[in-house]
Amino acid sequence: MNILVSPYNKENHYFRSDSTLIRTVPEFYIPDFVESISATPILVFRVDLPGKVIDKKFANRYLGKFMYGVMLTPQMKESVHPDFQEYLKHSLDYSTIIPAIMTEKESLDKFLSEENPFTVEINGWERFRCTQNIPLDKVYEKFSRMTQFCSVRTGDYIAFE
């Protein structure tokens, strides 16, 4: 199982290993080699069918349920070798939080609102609030671009920052 990530307002994508996946984080241990952690909200879809070079008009067949989650990205201490920093940035254990319960993609356009926002709280402080969803056509377009370069398998996750 892979986690493919599409950064916000960028055309590229990268992978996070399945060892980064966790369903809930009641407490997060920050390793000694990490200076700080940033939290990035993500919209995540589960892949229902394997494929490669998937056209935008067929993307809805491949992407299944969705949910919002959070990616934790470490900033390393200067003592960590620069080459190792890039590796750890995308592979720190338990740093991709995707809830186990997901929702049908057909409800995406009505999922968030002012009354039902997605929020990220750190130590009780609200750090992020989202009340609007990414349109499905934009999701399908980015997914199609990703599959031009890599295959997707059933059970993979596609995360959009």
Feature locations, PLM:
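Catalytic-core "active-site belt" of small-molecule-metabolizing enzymes
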Residues: 1-157
